[in-house]
A protein has these predicted regions:
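A conserved segment at the C-terminal end of the G1
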Residues: 1
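Flexible active-site lid/hinge loop adjacent to a nucleotide/diphosphate
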Residues: 4-123, 154-160
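Short amphipathic alpha-helical face segments that pack within enzyme cores
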Residues: 14, 169-175
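A generic structural signal for residues located within well-ordered alpha-helices
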Residues: 74, 92, 165-171
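C-terminal accessory "lid"/substrate-recognition subdomains
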Residues: 110-134, 144, 165-166
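Acidic-glycine-rich active-site phosphate/pyrophosphate-binding loop
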Residues: 130-154
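Gly/charged, well-structured mid-domain segments that form the phosphate/adenylate-handling core
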Residues: 160-165, 175-181
Length: 181
């Protein structure tokens, strides 16, 4: 209803607490940045869905993070804070992200830009859930049963599939929605 609580960078725990403490807020999508986690925690106790899209070198050397494993450990706190009946969404194309799966104590959904990703295929063959690209379309699957969610051509943010980082974000968001039901 056009109610703005705060403008600007709202990726930290203070912003999350402000947002979640507002009685008008019924649901929230929060970006939880590495620096904010280190300085003030997550800003919430438990979530219904936790998503880790990637782990990259862009923040190494900051806040005592010397290698990708340090950064992965910090980001894994997002998974540990998912409610047991909730869902963790992980990028099957990023081996370091995928290696965090044991830290999740909830249902897992993998996403991948590649329909033949080995981890994704194994997870689906075991009855798991996943979201992937197939023939220029976003597909959501449970076990061996999949359904087309949307063609990439209908998503301008992906530049017709050329902006791979945004395609990956679409897959992650689709997986999060699948996780919510």
């Amino acid at each position: 209803d056009d109610h703005c609580l705060l403008r600007g960078d709202t990726t930290g725990p203070w912003s999350a607490r402000l947002l979640l403490g507002d009685p008008l807020v019924e649901a929230a999508v929060l970006e939880t940045a590495r620096g904010g986690i280190l300085r003030g925690g997550l800003g919430y106790d438990l979530s219904d869905v936790g998503v880790i899209t990637n782990i990259s070198r862009d923040h190494l050397g900051q806040d005592g993070l010397e290698d990708l494993e340090d950064l992965a450990f910090v980001k894994s706190l997002v998974l540990e804070a998912v409610h047991p009946e909730g869902c963790a969404v992980l990028n099957a194309d990023d081996p370091l992200v995928a290696s965090l799966a044991p830290r999740a104590r909830c249902r897992l959904i993998y996403f991948s830009l590649k329909e033949d990703n080995v981890l994704l295929r194994r997870h689906l063959s075991e009855g798991g859930e996943g979201v992937f690209l197939q023939g220029g379309q976003v597909v959501a699957a449970r076990g061996e049963e999949g359904m087309v969610v949307v063609p990439l051509a209908n998503l301008p943010v992906t530049w017709y599939g050329q902006a791979q980082h945004n395609v990956a974000n679409v897959l992650a968001a689709t997986a999060a929605c699948l996780g919510l039901g």
